[in-house]
């Protein structure tokens, strides 16, 4: 989560901490015409001509840039310089960013998108500690949801409710490391159920059947585990697909890629159909 010029918006990416200037650049990128949210809105508008108008707006969850502890050069709000050694200043910066996201989203007047909540991009609380709890209070006051996706057994994963999150998705962290056995997926599904968590489905373009060092079988293992544990029927699911994993699978001419895409698509369509019937 960085700007491509060396500045980071979360822990663990680069050493240079993003300042208010970089936060504003990120906001401009999120709401840039023809990109990101605007492109998504246009895409849905185009598809409506083919499949008809849905009975709902697509819900959007936007990530929050993290106020990085010990940062002193972030900038000012209302003329007051902020020091992220102080948690109160971290909360103030997060509130400012949330306000910016909400204001710009409203101003954009998207036809097909609804801002439903915010996502905490840190995948553990080793450094941010209990900061999410105080940010959550502001988010809930705005009547929005607070979402988290901790990595496998990350610090604080089993405290997600106490930290103020409305939903947390368990990352199996299986797809990308080939020496992790498929049993990790069973364990992740069971762990998520035990702690009241949802699940994340992970893949990228390495899932292509004919690509070098293919991870096709690992994506297949996710689908099988989710079927075996009734995740598709009973759980919320977040999908991490790299930059264009599903797009590459869609464009592939391989029969095996079509087979796995169809298998996943059937579950997604069934989930949407069930949801529509219950409304």
Over which residues does each language-model region extend?
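N-terminal catalytic cores of secreted or lumenal carbohydrate-active enzymes
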Residues: 1-92
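Short helix-terminating capping/connector loops at secondary-structure junctions
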Residues: 51-57, 110-115, 231-234
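Aromatic-lined carbohydrate-recognition surfaces of secreted/lumenal glycan-active proteins
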Residues: 55-73, 77-98, 114-125, 136-157, ...
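Substrate-binding cleft of secreted/luminal carbohydrate-active enzymes
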Residues: 153, 164-279
């Amino acid at each position: 989560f960085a700007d491509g010029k060396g500045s980071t918006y979360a822990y663990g990416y680069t050493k240079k901490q993003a300042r208010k200037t970089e936060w504003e650049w990120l906001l401009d990128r999120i709401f840039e015409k023809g990109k990101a949210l605007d492109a998504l809105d246009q895409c849905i508008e185009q598809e409506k001509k083919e499949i008809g108008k849905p009975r709902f707006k697509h819900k959007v969850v936007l990530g929050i840039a993290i106020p990085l502890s010990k940062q002193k050069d972030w900038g000012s709000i209302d003329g007051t310089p902020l020091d992220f050694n102080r948690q109160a200043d971290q909360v103030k910066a997060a509130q400012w960013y949330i306000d910016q996201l909400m204001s710009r989203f409203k101003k954009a007047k998207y036809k097909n998108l609804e801002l439903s909540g915010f996502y905490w991009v840190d995948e553990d609380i080793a450094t941010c500690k209990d900061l999410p709890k105080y940010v959550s209070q502001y988010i809930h006051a705005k009547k929005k949801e607070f979402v988290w996706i901790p990595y496998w057994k990350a610090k604080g994963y089993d405290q997600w409710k106490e930290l103020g999150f409305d939903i947390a998705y368990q990352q199996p962290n299986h797809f990308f490391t080939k020496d992790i056995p498929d049993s990790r997926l069973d364990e992740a599904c069971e762990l998520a159920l035990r702690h009241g968590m949802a699940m994340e489905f992970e893949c990228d373009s390495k899932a292509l059947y004919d690509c070098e060092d293919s991870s096709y079988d690992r994506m297949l293992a996710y689908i099988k585990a989710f079927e075996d544990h009734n995740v598709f029927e009973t759980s919320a699911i977040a999908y991490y697909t790299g930059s264009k994993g599903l797009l590459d699978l869609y464009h592939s001419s391989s029969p095996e890629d079509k087979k796995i895409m169809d298998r996943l698509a059937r579950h997604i369509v069934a989930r949407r159909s069930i949801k529509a019937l219950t409304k």
